[in-house]
Amino acid sequence: MKRIDFENGTVTNNILSAALPMLVAQILNLLSNSVDRIYIARIHDIGTTALGAVGLCFPIIMIITAFSNLFGSGGAPIFSINRGKGDSRTADMIMNTAFTMLCGSAAVLMLIGFLFARPLLTLFGASDDALVYAYPYLMIYLLGTLPSMIATGMNPFINAQGYAIIGMLSVTVGAVANIILDPIFIFVLDMGIKGAAIATVISQILSALLVFYFLHGKSELKVRWIHINEISECTRHARDIISLGSAGFIMQLTNSLVSICCNNVLSMTGGDIYISVMTIISSVRQMVETPIHAINEGTSPVLSYNYGARRPDRVKKAGVVLIIMVLIYTGIMWSVILIAPEFLIGIFSSDKLLLKDAVPALKLYFAAFIFMDLQYIGQTVFKSLNKKKQAIFFSLLRKVFIVVPLTYFLPYGLHMGTDGVFMAEPVSNVIGGSLCFITMLVTILPELNKMGNSR
């Protein structure tokens, strides 16, 4: 089974070897999610309303993803750093501490979701019409909480061991299954939006089974339940995992918060049609960002492993490659968004009324998108090098202290209406992205230079 050697070979090849399988997997996963929404949007008579209803479920789905990232993104870099140091025992304990916390959190989240689904959806801006479709979709989706979290949260530990192809396959299995099952459950079995949720849950179960099969039976370091006599040691590791993972967790959680705020303001200023517009914009953003996340996640284990091995030259090279690849890709996609927004929106809906409102909203939302790259690059470096404070601070800064206040101030304070909601994003990209990137340069480079001089 081919494995990436993060300490040897060219840095660019290491990153590409890790990033390309992730890119394939994430594109398939994106295609799966997009197909889900495309089919839902084309359900006869209720498509646009049903699409908006799914968008109302996004905050809860984001919260589940946030907890997956708390343990996956928090544990995998520390896992890689310890592998770089040659400390396999600590790496093993970190992975299994993350697994135990992940499973416990999944049970709690599923229970809370079942108990409070209806009031939460109402809080998120669901009208009575939208609630008819959002509630059953969410109740079925919640059944897949544990497999969803295992598939998402434990996959980074596969990639961190250098098995990028296996990581890709675990995502691919679920994505392909969802693409096949969606039309069967939605149209052939005439289950509508409930069918879309059932197809999603089945696909998540398949992905989780493959992840668990590999980590439990085939990988060098195997996933297992922690023993009673390991609890005290695992408590210390749990604090480290949660501390580092809080950055990604906060980013996902604040995405959910922003989604709630946007839906509430859009519901008041534009009605249900603008919630559907935001759902499409979120889908386009997910599509555009997929390769960026693949590059970031492909670079992360290279950064972490070589930082643990005290190879600052390779850490610097990985950072430069990350910056170049992300900025070139985003420059191309940014141009496509501004030149041909109708094409991107048309992928998700053919509703002419929706298209009329969505085109200017999309252009406004992505007006300064390239600055968002600076945030992603900085966050990836901070997380990979176990810089907890910086990672957490910049996760909070952009979303909580810039986007959320602007989402209310621009529409109501400056009377910009729905445009104000979409304008909040580019303003936050410029401010938050620039500050994060500059801070990374002035704090990380001196440390790496010092590490190099001490070798």
Predicted features along the sequence, with ranges:
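Transmembrane alpha-helix boundary and packing residues in multipass membrane permease domains
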Residues: 22, 26, 38, 77, ...
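Helix-terminus/linker motif at the lipid-water interface of multi-pass membrane proteins
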Residues: 27, 31-52, 121-128, 184-191, ...
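N-terminal transmembrane alpha-helices
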Residues: 6-38, 42-46, 59-74, 78, ...
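Small-residue hotspots at the loop-to-helix junctions and early N-terminal turns
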Residues: 48-59, 134, 138, 197, ...
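Small-residue-rich hydrophobic transmembrane alpha-helices
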Residues: 51-111, 148-167, 263, 275-335, ...
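Short alpha-helical transmembrane segments in multi-pass integral membrane proteins
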Residues: 1-19, 79-144, 188-245, 303-368, ...
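Short runs within selected transmembrane alpha-helices of multi-pass transporters and secretion channels
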Residues: 69-72, 141-159, 167-178, 196-211, ...
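Transmembrane helical elements of multi-pass membrane transporters/channels
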Residues: 17-36, 140, 174, 203-207, ...
